[in-house]
Amino acid sequence: RTEYRRLSHHLYLPMPGGDIAAREPWRMAVSLLYSLYGENMPLPDDFVKRVGEDRIKLVSRMIARRINTPLSSGAGRLFDAVASLLGIADFNRYRSEAPQKLEQVADRSILKIYSFDKDNPLDFSWLVKAVLNDLQKGVPCSEIASAFHRTYAAMWCVELAKQAVRQKLSRVVLC
């Protein structure tokens, strides 16, 4: 008989508007930044122009007051947020469009991996800061998308290795 246990997950993020947040990745971008920075979140100018200050304020209030904001620790919502911050997709016309576009934009020749805390690899605040920093510096979205993907994979490899040793496991599964 096989037994499965959830050993790790990254930060839970509010999904402002519930399922609507999966169709409107900009909501997850606001959620991500609000969760990490609070009301003083660093919003890229281009993002504010595309989405609008009123929408951002409304969603921020929803998160602050915990109104219709179920939590998600799914990778898809994180990828939605990053795709929106990079200006790749603010709205999904079909399921997982933003993460797919983020992957398509990634320049596979870029081997950059952002540095991260190997003792706490699932704390992705450093990853978001690195993405925002590169965005502010004018690094092409294709390079940022590649570094984001590579870093996200690397952090999970570190976490899986840690859990395998800690739990004395010979097999681990990503779900």
Regions of interest found by a model, annotated:
Residues 1-2:
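Gly/Thr-rich phosphate-binding beta-strand-loop-beta motif of the actin/hexokinase/Hsp70
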Residues 5-21, 43-45, 62-67:
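Short beta-alpha connecting loops at secondary-structure transitions
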Residues 25, 29-30:
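N-terminally biased helix-coil "hinge/interface" segments that flank
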Residues 31-169:
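A contiguous, well-structured pocket-lining segment that forms one wall/lid of small-molecule binding clefts
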Residues 170-175:
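Glycine-rich phosphate-binding loops at beta-strand->alpha-helix junctions
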